[in-house]
Amino acid sequence: MSLTSTSKRLVSLDVLRGITVCGMILVNNAGACGYAYAPLKHAKWDGFTPADLVFPAFMFIMGVSIYLSLNKSNFDWRVSIARILRRTALIFVSGVSLKWILAFIATGEYNTLENLRIMGVLQRLGICYGIVALLAVTVRHRLFPTIIAVLLVGYYLLQLFGNGFEKCAGNIVSMVDYAVLGKSHMYLGGAQFVDPEGILSTIPAIAQVMIGFLCGKVIVGEKEIRSQIVKLAVWGTSMFVIGYLWSYAAPLNLSLIHISEPTRLRCIS
């Protein structure tokens, strides 16, 4: 898992990225929706299938890539902040524009701003990239584990006291999406109650990217491959155990990203 001397690329990360892209192609082009192979379908609510590993893997990859990229400038905010803000805006706007174009191709009609979906996959990637990258150049990295714990536990408490585990309009995640985004700007016009890439569920998504960032730090900081493998294996096993135990209180759910989801699925990456 070392960086090659000529290209300065992390081969293991490129391999994981390639596997994830292949998985995305299979999931997004699985054939007729009613006849797709079951493992290529997303879980409808609680639980997860192999298809649900794709997006979390991208989040993990982004976290590792953020460390590798900002490490080149020694995490100097004066050098990096303009690039971070520009890239964040570009990713977010690209996501909104792509949704608008695809909607036109599918229906032949232009979506107005009144019913254009605001959030989405690229939008979430852009938001998470921007926040984690800004934290990386402004906050001591040793505080990242604490921030991750605060984000995950805080999100769990919001769900616990806000009916956050039910698929209904009274779910706090749904209520915030309705209030901030508006029903017409949500996934499927709000018919699914929650937006899979909504406002509150972005909180644990940020933690996912931060976990990838810390793994990138291990890969760069530990010069011996054996040491890298041991440390990452210990982290991965620990996260799996924590996620498994916590799943009894908060079952795996990709739409809401319960606290058990970032820990268990990130250990697989």
Regions found by a protein language model. Give the residues of each.
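N-terminal signal-anchor module of multipass membrane proteins
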Residues: S2-F75, S80
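Juxtamembrane membrane-water interface segments of multi-pass membrane proteins
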Residues: S2-S12, S65-R83, L214-K231, Y248-S255
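Kinked, hydrophobic transmembrane alpha-helices enriched for aromatic residues
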Residues: L10-Y37, L90-A103, I131, V241-W246
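Membrane-interface interhelical loops and short amphipathic "cap" helices
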Residues: A30-T49, L102-I118, K167-A179, S184-D195, ...
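Transmembrane alpha-helical segments and their boundary/interface "anchor" motifs
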Residues: A51-A57, K72-K99, A103-V132, A136-Y155, ...
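Specific transmembrane alpha-helix
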Residues: V54-N71, L125-L134, S201-G221, M239, ...
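Long hydrophobic alpha-helical segments that form multi-pass transmembrane helix bundles
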Residues: H141-I211
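Residue-level detector of conserved catalytic or cofactor/ligand-binding positions
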Residues: S255-S269
